Amino acid sequence: MSSRGARLSSPSSSLERPASQDSQDSMEDYWSEVKNIEEDGERAHEDLLERGSMDEAELEEAWLQEAGLSTLMSGELGEGPAEALLSTLTRSQAAMVKKRVDNYTLTMRKRNKQPARHVQDVFSTPDTLLVDPILPVSPKSPNGHMPSRCIHRTSSRVRPAFPSFSPVERRVSECPPPQETSDTLSFQVPYSEGVTAHRRGRQGDCQDCQLIRRDDPDLPTFQLPRPKLGLTHIQDLSCEDMKKIGYISLIELTTFYDCLGIELKRNRAARSKARESGIFGVPLTTLLENDQKKCPGSKVPLVFRKLLSKLEQTGLQTEGILRVPGSASRVKHLRQELEQKFYEERFDWEQVRHNDAAGLLKMFIRELPYPLLTLQHLPAFAAAQSVSSPRHQIQALHLLIMLLPEPNRDTLKALLEFLRKVVAYEEKNRMSLWNVSMIVAPNLFTYRGKNAKQEEMQGAAGAAHLVRLLITYQELLWTVPCFLISHVRKLNEASKKPPSSEKTKRKLLLMRKRNAEKTERSELTDLREGVIRVHAPLHAKISMAIQLDNETKAKDVTARFDYENGRGSRSTSQRPVQYLFEVGGNIGERCLDPETHLLDVYHVNPHCEWLLKPKTT
């Protein structure tokens, strides 16, 4: 058990100053928690991880599949989603994909000793350029962006070029021009494009590393950029768009780490004998499937929500909450009762003490058959410990959050929101940000295998530092960078380009002609430039044409509908809160921030529909 000095230690204790008594005491919290976990004997299953069992081909295959590029491993070249994604990558990202495909191809050739698909068949590199596949950059680069590479093939089947990504420049950028200072974090360009000094092996020249270093006494306060297109949170995008965000994020994270000189490793998940019913040791997806039968729309396991609620009601002001363990025998008994009675609604929550609830909460996280941070991405989270500055660490974590499966991401967010509340009551509960991070870290970052103890000792302080970053910057981390949204827009546009087949072209043109004839009358009498039609099916007035100007915001439209429908059949107080969405065009669906400037959205996505409706829960 840690001393009172540890309880009062400041969250600003440095990770890089071992002589600091505060840091030593805080580390005592970490090892005390590890000891409690070992005494519980409930470490997660060892058989999930088979380190070193994946060869190069399997590693690359898993990466390409998760990046949405599995068709590059086999089959004929086409004009499908993978090719559309490739056409939108930056030069650095395309080079990273090429490296992965090349490695996969060479490994397969060695394994099978027979011809396999070569990387030049994917990236259309001429034979004369096999040694140096990157072609010279054209000096005529519009708006300062990298131009597309001009790719030629001797074959009659021509692959599309792999242009550098940039926002839809002919309309408007997703973010304002980057004016990054020590307290701002630019979302405009991919993070990998901002670490040129690292890529050239000059880490000391990196401005970000000079501005903020890990051994600074306090964490920096980053301000979220306020783009005219509005902030977009993860829950504001459609599932299909978030799936594409995941593809792009993995490619960008791998490129970003490569620029920083970090090898992105992956764990291999073996088949697990996970339970299909009950509470503890059940996969998140299974828990949610069972929960949604009782409570449709549940995004976080009900028992997890209930444990958090219990702690918030009774434990936030309790000294040593999370640190002081409950009775082992009591926790074991409560666990058994939860398994038997929770879903029958017969479990008595009044009998649960706050320290026991904290023990059950941590036990639930540890016993997930697949880690909350996911088995395949746990090494990438751990690798962020070796990044040189908090700014780059936050950027790495930002991309990793985008990569997490939805159940893991939602459950992690619920946990972090609770931990932030614990820290807010530090004066009462004596639990600083640093204390909380030290105690939570060994429950999130589980080390397994024969070298687990050594790895845990080496990564203890770094793991706790990452938890501290997750708690502190959670609002930023759950905001989708606008360079990713711009990339999705461009990907959606690339996916809608007409196919090259003449027969398919003729069919498409005929279909478009018929559709044009059907809508010709409405188009002639419809909206003029700068006017949008907003549909509001839940209002008495279900449609309204609105003239946009430079100051029109999403909140102005919702307010106007509320005013116009004030005397409708349902009063505003009875109606659920509604938000303005852009639907279709070059996005699946996006809920607009109330501060969004609509004329800018109109220019970026001129073919979208405008819909006023409640958020999906």
Predicted regions mapped to residue ranges:
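Intrinsically disordered regulatory linkers and targeting segments
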Residues: M1-E350, M438, P442-R521, L527, ...
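Eukaryotic basic, amphipathic alpha-helical target segments in cytosolic regions
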Residues: L288, Q292, L308-L316, L338-F342, ...
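Conserved, well-structured core segments
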Residues: P301-V303, N355-M363, A414, R468-L469, ...
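Interface signal in eukaryotic adaptor modules for cytoskeleton, membrane trafficking
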Residues: G315-L404, L433-S437, R575-D593
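Alpha-helical bundle/repeat cores within regulatory domains of eukaryotic proteins
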Residues: H377-L378, P390-A464
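Eukaryote-biased recognition of intrinsically disordered, low-complexity regulatory segments
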Residues: R521-A545
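Short, contiguous acidic and Ser/Thr-rich linear segments
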Residues: A540-D556
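Eukaryotic mixed-charge, acidic/polar low-complexity intrinsically disordered regions
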Residues: E582-T617
